[in-house]
Design a protein with these regions (language model features):
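Aromatic-rich carbohydrate-recognition surfaces in CAZymes
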Residues: 53-56, 63-72, 142, 197, ...
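Acidic-aromatic substrate-binding/catalytic surfaces of carbohydrate-active enzymes
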Residues: 17-84, 177-179, 208-212, 216, ...
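Acidic/polar, glycine-enriched structural segments that form the non-catalytic walls/loops
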Residues: 1-2, 10, 108-109, 113-115, ...
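Non-catalytic C-terminal accessory modules of carbohydrate-active enzymes
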Residues: 18, 29-31, 37-41, 50-51, ...
C-alpha cells in the first residue's frame, strides 16, 4: 500500500486507542482533543456549524506549534500564522498518509523539512495501542547554496501553559494535565548546502480525567439495573484514562516514545505486512483506523466507550454491530468488553425488562436494537468460541426478544406504529423489512444459542422452533415480490401509520442475514434464490452515477419507477424531512451489499460495489462520513442537503466506516460453528491475511486468484479447520 496525498484536508489524527488525539497537517496542530471529551463543540452545534469540515481553510489552531529556527529566524511548521505563537508561517508542500503514518512537508526559506509522524499501534496488544504520544521523525535538507544553522523545537501558547525543563524535555503544565516534548538533538546544527540532517522528537500528553456526555458513569455500568435509580447530580465524577495505569506524567510518556520509537515502527510495519489486499481495499481498511483514534475513550476499569460522531452517543448498538469488525480483526477482546457492558446494563425487571439501549444509558430507539443485540452476541460467540459469554448473555437475549415481541409483536412478526429505526428520517411503519429481517435471524441465533446450552428456546411461551417458520412464512407473504424479485421496504398495517412507498427497493433488506452470516446454518433460513434475486435487483435498480468523481453509489431506497424516487421525501419539518434518508447512499449498506454478493456467489459484482465505495470515498479515507451522496429532486447526485456534516468528507470519520474490515472475511467466505472454521474463498482476487485470531484458534491464509487447490499446513486438504487445535496455515493455490 502506498501513501495517499491528503493535502486538501486538515491532516492526520495522532493518538492511540482511548488516549485523546490531535490532528497535524497543513495548518499545523488542529482539532486538539488530548483533554476531556473530544469534539464537544462540534457535537453541541450539530447539525449546524461547520466544525466537521475536513477541507476548512481557517480551522482553529492548537495551543502548540512545531518550529524551526533557521539562523536567527523562527519558522512555524504550518501554512498560516498562529494567533498566539510568534513565528513566520512556512510554505506547505504536501501531506500524505498511510495510517497510522502521516508525512507532512514544509519549506522554510532554503530548508525543506519532512515530518514523519506516528503513534504506537500494535495488533492484539491494547496496552501498546493506547499510549498518549506522537513520534516525529524530521528529515531536514538544505536546498540552498549557503550553510544554515538549524534548531528544532515546540512552541506553545504562554497563556495556556506554564513551562519547565526536566531531563532535556520541555514540560508544559496546566491545571488538569499537560504535555511534554523532547528531541534527540537539542543543540543547533549547521547544515551545509545540499546536506540533510535527521532528528527524532516526541510529544507526550497526560490528561487523566474525562467526563462523557449522557448518563455513562462508572458507578452505573457495573451495577445491574441501577439505571432505574439514576440521579444525574449524584453521578458527575469523571473517568480515569487507562494510560494512567502505566504513566505518571507527560514526561514519562515522551521519554518512552523517544526510547522505543523504533519498536513502534516495527509494530506498525508488522500490522501493514499482516494483510495483503488490493490498494483501494487496503486504503479503506487501514484508513478507518482514523475512527479508532478519534472516537474511543478507554478507562482504568478496562471498559471503553466509542462515540458515534457527531452525535455524542456512546457504543450505539446499530453502529457497533458494523464498526466492531475492525476490533474483531485486530483487538477482538474489545467486542467482548462492549457486549458485557450491555449485558450488565440492560434492565432485567420491571416494564422495560429486556429493552436494549440504542446507545449506552440514553437515546433508546423504538424497537430496533433488541434483535441486533441477540445476533451480535451469537456472532461473537462463533468468532471467539467463548462459551462463558454465551451462558452470561443467554437470559438477557431471551429478555430482549420477549420485550420486543411483547411490545411490537403481531402474529409472528414485528409491527411498529411509527417505523422509527436505524434509517432515521426514512420511517418504515408496520411490517418493516429492516427490523423483521433482523427478527428472523435473532430468533435463529437464539435457538442456536439455546441448543448449545441444552436449553429450550422459548419466547413468551412460544417455541422458537415453531415461531421462526411461521415468522418466515409471514415475512415472505407480507414483503416478497415474486415478479420483481425483492422484499419491500415495509408494509403498512391497521396498527401503523399509513406512509406510502412501502414497495421501495430497500438496499439493506438483508441486514439481518449479513450480521448472522458467520453461521453456516444461517444460509438455510431465506432461500438462496430469493437472496440472489434481491441482491441483483438492488445492484441494478438503486445504482446512481456520480459524474463528479466517476463512481457509482447505491440509494438506500428507490421506488419501482425509479425516476419517481424523490417523491419519497415528504417535508414535515426543517430537519427531519420524512423519507429523506431513502434518497441517500449509506456507506455501510453499500459495503454490506458488497459482502453479501460474495456470500451468495456473486464475487465480481461484490468487488465492483466495494471498489465504487472506495472510489467514492477517494482520498477522504480518514474522513469518511455516514453517507457518500444523496440525490436531488431530479435524481441528480448531490451532497446531503440537510446534513452536509454527515456526507463525505467529514471529520472525525463516522464510526460505522470501520465495517470495511468485514470485507476480507466475506471474500474468504469464512463461516464458523463451535467445532470448525470453514473457508471457501472467492477466486477473483489475490489476498493474504496473517494471524486471524478467533479465540484460541489462529490461522493465516493466502488466496491466489483462480485457485483450484487448498493446502492446510502444506498438505492438500479440505479447507475445514478443527477448533481448539492451535495455529493453522491455509493456502489456496492455482496449480493448473
Amino acid at each position: 500500500m502506498n501513501y495517499t496525498d491528503i493535502s486538501h484536508g486538515l491532516g492526520v489524527p495522532f493518538g492511540g486507542f482511548g488516549t485523546g488525539y490531535f490532528v497535524f497537517g497543513r495548518h499545523g496542530f488542529v482539532n486538539f482533543n488530548v483533554d476531556g471529551y473530544p469534539e464537544q463543540q462540534q457535537t453541541a452545534e450539530y447539525p449546524h456549524g461547520t466544525l466537521w469540515d475536513y477541507t476548512a481553510e481557517n480551522p482553529s489552531c492548537g495551543p502548540i506549534a512545531l518550529y524551526a529556527d533557521i539562523d536567527s529566524v523562527r519558522w512555524l511548521l504550518q501554512k498560516d500564522s498562529h494567533p498566539s505563537i510568534e513565528g513566520n508561517p512556512s510554505v506547505f508542500v504536501k501531506n500524505e498518509v498511510k495510517m497510522p503514518y502521516g508525512k507532512t512537508v514544509f519549506l522554510a526559506g532554503d530548508i525543506r523539512i519532512e515530518l514523519l509522524m506516528y503513534s504506537s499501534l500494535k495488533r492484539f496488544d491494547l496496552t501498546r495501542t493506547s499510549i498518549p504520544a506522537c513520534v516525529i521523525e524530521y528529515t531536514v535538507t538544505n536546498t540552498g547554496c549557503n550553510s544554515h544553522t538549524v534548531s528544532l523545537g515546540l512552541a506553545y501558547d504562554t497563556d495556556k501553559y506554564t513551562a519547565e525543563t526536566k531531563n532535556n524535555l520541555l514540560v508544559l503544565n496546566e491545571g488538569n494535565g499537560g504535555m511534554a516534548f523532547g528531541i534527540n538533538k537539542t543543540n543547533s546544527q549547521v547544515l551545509s548546502a545540499g546536506e540533510t540532517g535527521n532528528y527524532v522528537g516526541a510529544i507526550g500528553w497526560y490528561y487523566p480525567e474525562f467526563v462523557t456526555q449522557g448518563l455513562a458513569r462508572d458507578d452505573i455500568i457495573l451495577r445491574h439495573n441501577s439505571i432505574k435509580d439514576y440521579k444525574e447530580t449524584e453521578h458527575r465524577k469523571g473517568y480515569i484514562r487507562n494510560y494512567t495505569l502505566r504513566y505518571e506524567n507527560a514526561a514519562d510518556v515522551a521519554t518512552d516514545a523517544l526510547l522505543h520509537y523504533e519498536e513502534w515502527k516495527d509494530d506498525i510495519n508488522a500490522w501493514h505486512g499482516a494483510f495483503s489486499f488490493p490498494d483501494e481495499t487496503a486504503k479503506l481498511l487501514f484508513g478507518s483506523y482514523s475512527s479508532v483514534i478519534t472516537s474511543s475513550l478507554y478507562t482504568t476499569q478496562g471498559y471503553y466507550f466509542e462515540i458515534e460522531q457527531p452525535h455524542g452517543c456512546l457504543n450505539t448498538m446499530d453502529v457497533s454491530v458494523y464498526s466492531t469488525w475492525l476490533y474483531m480483526m485486530n483487538w477482538p477482546e474489545l467486542e467482548e468488553i462492549d457486549l458485557y457492558q450491555y449485558i450488565r446494563t440492560i434492565p432485567m425487571e420491571g416494564e422495560t425488562a429486556g429493552k436494549v439501549w440504542h446507545s449506552l444509558w440514553a437515546d433508546s430507539a423504538h424497537y430496533v436494537e433488541e434483535a441486533i443485540f441477540v445476533i451480535r452476541v451469537w456472532r461473537y460467540v462463533l468468532w471467539s468460541g467463548n462459551r462463558q459469554i454465551l451462558e452470561d448473555a443467554w437470559p438477557v437475549c431471551k429478555a430482549a426478544l420477549e420485550y420486543l415481541y411483547s411490545t411490537e409483536g403481531s402474529g409472528a412478526l414485528i409491527d411498529n406504529i411509527s417505523g422509527n429505526q436505524s434509517y432515521d428520517a426514512w420511517k418504515m411503519p408496520g411490517i418493516c423489512n429492516y427490523v423483521n429481517n433482523q427478527w428472523l435471524y435473532a430468533l435463529f441465533s437464539f435457538e442456536r444459542m439455546s441448543n448449545q446450552l441444552g436449553k429450550e428456546a422459548i419466547v413468551l411461551g412460544k417455541k422458537v422452533s415453531e415461531l421462526l417458520p411461521e415468522a418466515l412464512k409471514q415475512y415472505n407473504e407480507a414483503l416478497w415480490d415474486e415478479k420483481e424479485g425483492y422484499w419491500y421496504a415495509y408494509k403498512v398495517t391497521e396498527k401503523s401509520n399509513r406512509l406510502p412507498f412501502g414497495n421501495a427497493v430497500f438496499s439493506d433488506q438483508l441486514f439481518g442475514f449479513w450480521a448472522a452470516s458467520l453461521d453456516p446454518e444461517a444460509y438455510g433460513i431465506l432461500s438462496n434464490e430469493q437472496c440472489v434475486r434481491a441482491l441483483k435487483k438492488i445492484y441494478v435498480h438503486n445504482r446512481v452515477y456520480v459524474p463528479n468523481g466517476d463512481y457509482y453509489c447505491w440509494l438506500n431506497g428507490a421506488l419501482p419507477e425509479k425516476e419517481k424516487t424523490p417523491s419519497i421525501e415528504m417535508n414535515d419539518g426543517i430537519y427531519e424531512h420524512c423519507g429523506y434518508h431513502a434518497l441517500c447512499c449509506w456507506i455501510c449498506a453499500e459495503t454490506g451489499m458488497a459482502s453479501l454478493m460474495y456470500r451468495f456467489g456473486l464475487p465480481q459484482t461484490g468487488e465492483d460495489v466495494f471498489y465504487n465505495v472506495a472510489k467514492g470515498i477517494g482520498n477522504n479515507h480518514l474522513a469518511a462520513g455516514e453517507y457518500n451522496r444523496g440525490v436531488d429532486e431530479n435524481m441528480k447526485p448531490e451532497t446531503l442537503r440537510y446534513e452536509p456534516g454527515k456526507d463525505t468528507p467529514r471529520f472525525p470519520a463516522y464510526p460505522r466506516y470501520k465495517c470495511a474490515w468485514e470485507h476480507p472475511i466475506a471474500i474468504l467466505n469464512l463461516q464458523a460453528d463451535l467445532d470448525n472454521i470453514y473457508l471457501n474463498p472467492a477466486k477473483n482476487v489475490n489476498i493474504a491475511l496473517s494471524e486471524i485470531r478467533m479465540g484460541s484458534d489462529v490461522f493465516s491464509v493466502t488466496v491466489e486468484k483462480n485457485w483450484d487447490t487448498c493446502l492446510v499446513g502444506g498438505i492438500e486438504a479440505k479447507p475445514v479447520l478443527k477448533r481448539n487445535e492451535g495455529k493453522h496455515t491455509v493456502e489456496f493455490i492455482k496449480t493448473k
